[in-house]
């Protein structure tokens, strides 16, 4: 069956329990599967980037499903031979138990593998992952090394989205770069301003008439009354008392010492 035979809008998103309890179980027992969407291939004879072309399903979700014959690495052993032409699949972490929700019985196990390009053990890790599902005998589920049932394993091959991974790495790098710019006071853009604020000392508020400089434009006739000047001078020199001049009387005030009389 090819992808062209699938009904419009078809999506294949089975759960772990469905993959083992229905698809793998019926395949091993020789029972009919309602919709044959999982082909049988010798998965380890191909590199992962060759597998999408072998799938019956469209590759929009970047995951593909296959039934794979269990090829033992050693004639008298139980380990599977997972070497390909360009690299090898390496198991990571512990196998996960897949339990039937209805009976709470362990139906099988899921093993996670990562593809390394090159020869073991010096291969380069890639962004290809795989979940390998295996069916086990119900009577053997309590053993440390369960007796796996059948000649097939069901494999879900996944290609991680490299664009999202790179975008996340770039975002984290930018956040680290921004954070490092402000990690210390020495690199803070506010340091110079802070230094200026700390070094700034306000001038003394004590008015000393001997140290006050008067512009030549401010040299006036002390015998005349300048109300506009006195108003401005009162704001500039609040601690001084300015004269009150009437028509026949003139009162002296301290600021006259700074004025040149005509």
Curated annotation (Swiss-Prot):
It comes from Arabidopsis thaliana (Mouse-ear cress). Residues 6-160 form the NAC domain. One of its GO terms (biological process) is response to wounding. Its main location: nucleus. The NAC domain includes a DNA binding domain and a dimerization domain. Transcription factor involved in tissue reunion of wounded inflorescence stems. Required for the division of pith cells in the reunion process, which is dependent on polar-transported auxin and the wound-inducible hormones ethylene and jasmonate. Binds to the promoters of XTH19 and XTH20 to induce their expression via auxin signaling. XTH19 and XTH20 are involved in cell proliferation in the tissue reunion process of incised stems. Involved in hypocotyl graft union formation. Required for the auxin- mediated promotion of vascular tissue proliferation during hypocotyl graft attachment. It is found in: Nucleus. Induction: Induced by wounding in the flowering stem. The lineage of its organism: Eukaryota, Viridiplantae, Streptophyta, Embryophyta, Tracheophyta. GO terms for molecular function: DNA-binding transcription factor activity; sequence-specific DNA binding. The keyword Transcription applies. GO terms for cellular component: nucleus. PANTHER family: (WILD MALAYSIAN BANANA) HYPOTHETICAL PROTEIN, PROTEIN CUP-SHAPED COTYLEDON 2-RELATED. This is NAC domain-containing protein 71. Keywords: DNA-binding, Nucleus, Transcription, Transcription regulation. Residues 107-166 bind DNA.
């Amino acid at each position: 069956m090819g992808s062209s035979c699938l009904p419009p809008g078809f999506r294949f998103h089975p759960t772990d329990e469905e993959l083992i309890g229905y698809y793998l179980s019926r395949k091993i027992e020789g029972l009919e599967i309602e919709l044959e969407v999982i082909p049988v291939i010798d998965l380890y004879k191909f590199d992962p980037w060759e597998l999408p072309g072998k799938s019956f399903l469209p590759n929009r979700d970047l995951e593909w499903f296959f039934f794979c014959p269990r090829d033992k690495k050693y004639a008298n052993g139980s380990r599977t031979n997972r070497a390909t032409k360009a690299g090898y699949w390496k198991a990571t972490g512990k196998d996960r138990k897949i339990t039937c929700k209805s009976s709470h019985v362990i139906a099988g196990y899921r093993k996670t593998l990562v593809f390394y390009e090159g020869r073991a053990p010096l291969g380069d890790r890639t962004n290809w992952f795989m979940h390998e599902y295996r069916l086990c005998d119900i009577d053997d589920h309590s053993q440390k090394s369960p007796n796996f049932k059948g000649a097939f394993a069901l494999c879900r091959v996944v290609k991680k989205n490299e664009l999202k991974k790179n975008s996340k790495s770039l975002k984290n790098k930018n956040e680290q770069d921004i954070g490092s710019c402000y990690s210390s006071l020495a690199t803070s853009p506010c340091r110079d301003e802070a230094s200026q604020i700390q070094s700034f000392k306000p001038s003394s508020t004590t008015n000393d008439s001997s140290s006050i400089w008067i512009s030549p434009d401010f040299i006036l006739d002390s015998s005349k009354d300048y109300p506009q000047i006195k108003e401005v001078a009162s704001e500039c020199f609040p601690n001084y008392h300015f004269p009150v001049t009437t028509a026949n009387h003139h009162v002296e005030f301290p600021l006259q010492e700074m004025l040149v009389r005509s």
